[in-house]
Amino acid sequence: MKTTFLDFEQPIAELEAKIEELRFVQDDSAVDISEEIERLSKKSQQLTKDLYTNLTPWQVSQIARHPQRPYTQDYINELFTDFHELHGDRSFADDLSIVGGLARFNGQPCMVIGHQKGRDTKERALRNFGMPRPEGYRKAERLMRLAEKFGLPLFTFIDTPGAYPGIGAEERGQSEAIGRNLYVMAELKTPIISTVIGEGGSGGALAVAVADSVLMLQFSTYSVISPEGCASILWKSAAKAPEAAEALGLTAHRLKALGLIDKIVSEPLGGAHRDPKGMAAMLRRALADSLRQFHGMSTNDLRQRRFDRLMAYGKFKETTPGA
């Protein structure tokens, strides 16, 4: 698949186009231009490295939304075996913006839940652009309780712009469904490991992210509102999104510094979409390390640790100037 380049990546796109053109010419030419191709390839790699070393929060937001970025289903296919998808909330419908089911991780039975976006117009509509309705969160709750019943570790993957704000969703209890999931996850008697793989949008993300260990991919985001939404409220213009992204502190490094996440999983040069299999391999190691730390921990200790973790959020100390 041809790589889609973002606006700020245009210098890289131009170099890659030149490299592709030379490769095409080389196939029909007696002149050896392999050295020139190699030189431009190294230049492209260095340019990508320089660019990705100095990303702004707004640029990170764009990468987190990249249309070719791996989604939950992609990670399920790469990281888990014997996946058996479970459908429906047993109350209203089956929301396809949430996928989940039984699987094995490194041979160990587990439960997997995550947001799922679409690749083309038809699938995006089918998946509601990764924005769950109440029935999606209630399906997730059902699978969480199944994981608890059978003593299975729970892996969740977060990638949503937010919960669906439609009238029907509100009528069916969107806020109640999200709140219920927060309550259930806080008390679940099994290890929970959550990973933000793309967008972590507000309560729609948090509803499957109350965990014993929270990971974030290097170029993912996690915030209470989108930069555009924040800009529209504070500055009455979505054009101020770059400033809003900076103020929101939505990047993995910022959230790690605040103690809101536990680990940052490095991405391949240019982002996860440049090397999905390489990204999956790095994430596998991170998930295995996170799961290992809860091995042998009693249910009471696990829940107490989770409770202490949640209660520590937002704590601060007041100091007297000059003290």
From Swiss-Prot:
Assembly description: Acetyl-CoA carboxylase is a heterohexamer composed of biotin carboxyl carrier protein (AccB), biotin carboxylase (AccC) and two subunits each of ACCase subunit alpha (AccA) and ACCase subunit beta (AccD).
Catalytic activity, as annotated: N(6)-carboxybiotinyl-L-lysyl-[protein] + acetyl-CoA = N(6)-biotinyl-L-lysyl-[protein] + malonyl-CoA
Protein name: Acetyl-coenzyme A carboxylase carboxyl transferase subunit alpha
Biological role: Component of the acetyl coenzyme A carboxylase (ACC) complex. First, biotin carboxylase catalyzes the carboxylation of biotin on its carrier protein (BCCP) and then the CO(2) group is transferred by the carboxyltransferase to acetyl-CoA to form malonyl-CoA.
Alphabetized SUPFAM superfamilies for the sequence: ClpP/crotonase
A GO biological-process term: malonyl-CoA biosynthetic process
Record carries keyword GTP-binding: no
Domain CoA carboxyltransferase C-terminal intervals: 39-293
Family named by the database record: Belongs to the AccA family.
EC number(s) per entry: 2.1.3.15
Keyword Nucleotide-binding: yes
Compartment list: Cytoplasm
